Amino acid sequence: MARLTTRPRRLLARLVSGRTGPDARFGARLLTTVAATALVSVPFALALLLVESQWPPLARLDHRTAERLHAAALEHPAWVRVLRFLTDVAWDPVTMRLLVAALVVWLLLRGALRLALWAAVTATAGGLLGLLVKHVVARARPHLPDPVAEAPGFSFPSGHAMTATTSCAVLLLALLPLVPRRLRPLAWVLAAVTVVGVGYTRVALGVHWVSDVAGGWLLGLAVVTATTLAFEAWRADVGRLRTTPAQGLEPEIRSEHPEPPVGVPDRP
């Protein structure tokens, strides 16, 4: 009985003293960076809203772009159908999240637990943070005559744009090591076209302002950057070399055992 009561105390002492090993530090960094991103991004979103509402050049850009693209949509109904397919099916947030979920399952089967955790936390944190900022800012969507599409909820930031940013970044950084070097530029182009294309469809369909889309991109990049820094810190803890975006997040994913078991240091 005495041993049972002393074990939790020892565990608590280890947590307080910080001697928890690289895996525990990795989890702590993930939570810390996600919280820091939320604290930084919400004031940024509010500041951006103030700029949008008070700075005439940005307001003119929002309204003129919306009016021109809406006029083009009314003149080309076939193009509207293409845009709706892209935004509601191919690039829908549900589609993006399912792709990330499939990636997480595959990574777990490969034994890449930390990379799977990074992917899941990045996607989840991005979605929750975007929803939080939407409700904090509570910006109305564009109101255009004869709308060609409608969308529920608030406008800033664009959830489609943010989900595309986080999802494409997760898929790209996780899978890039498996792509032949000569095809990696094509993978980057495909990801960029997807992210930009998602933003275009939302503005062209009249359900978002340009600044909404820009806000979604920026917030998504902030989340990816924060969680990626946490992952890189874990790699440094276990003695792995620092990677670059061109290499992908974990080049070892190509090997049979991409990560050491939890609690076991990496072999030199």
Task: Map each language-model feature to its residues.
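Membrane-embedded catalytic cores of phosphoryl/pyrophosphoryl-handling enzymes
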Residues: 146-257, 264-266
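Membrane-interface loops
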Residues: 66, 97-99, 104-186
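Alpha-helical transmembrane spans of integral membrane proteins, capturing the lipid-embedded, hydrophobic core
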Residues: 37-42, 89, 119, 123-127, ...
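Actinobacteria-biased recognition of intrinsically disordered, low-complexity terminal regions
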Residues: 1-34, 230, 234-268
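Alpha-helical membrane-inserting segments
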Residues: 43, 47, 129, 133, ...
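Hydrophobic alpha-helical transmembrane segments
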Residues: 31-35, 97, 116-121, 185-192, ...
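N-terminal transmembrane-helix/juxtamembrane module of multi-pass inner/ER membrane proteins
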Residues: 1-95, 137, 141-148
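Transmembrane helix-loop junctions in multipass membrane proteins, especially transporters and channels
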Residues: 53-57, 111-112, 138-143, 207, ...
